[in-house]
Amino acid sequence: MTILIRADEAETLSASGVTLLADMTDTDGHLTSHRSIFQPGKEGAPPHLHREAAELFFVLKGSLRVLTGEDLIVLGVGDFLHVPPNTPHAFEAAGDEPAEVLFVLTQAKPRFGYYRLLEGAYRGETDWAEVAATSGLYDNHYVESSAWQQRSLENKEVRL
């Protein structure tokens, strides 16, 4: 089935900077996709992993600092990254400009409910503990990462 989502028809979650494009239920279970804008100085996503889903990143504007495993890398405009299942990862804008990124998750569970829940947390309407409690439902499992915690203290970034 062919799917077309016009820019002016996509649902945008303003507090979190997420634009919902297509979910698993829209693509016959093939993929879910969204676009996110990350503001400088604000963490985009804390360390987490997906047990079932692979996550693809494509940077449209700005640059994105990404944890993948225990490595920190910086992606620039036009860079593509594939993070396989069970790989801890996190991300945020790198530098002084917002980062705009297209995400595609394959083999994923439907995720739009997760992004709407996050939107509520960013607005202060949902407790963050409620977000964490949905890890099994949305295949979003939060993990600890010393590399991510120390990212501002060490210069371990590698330009791809």
Where would I find each of the regions flagged by the language model?
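Short acidic-glycine-tyrosine-enriched beta hairpin
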Residues: 4, 70-88
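A short glycine-rich, His/Asp/Glu-containing loop-to-beta-strand
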Residues: 10-47, 53
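Ligand-binding loop in jelly-roll beta-barrel domains
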Residues: 85-112
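Short beta-strand segments
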Residues: 45-47, 68-73
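Acidic/histidine-enriched, glycine/proline-rich intrinsically disordered or flexible terminal extensions
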Residues: 116-160
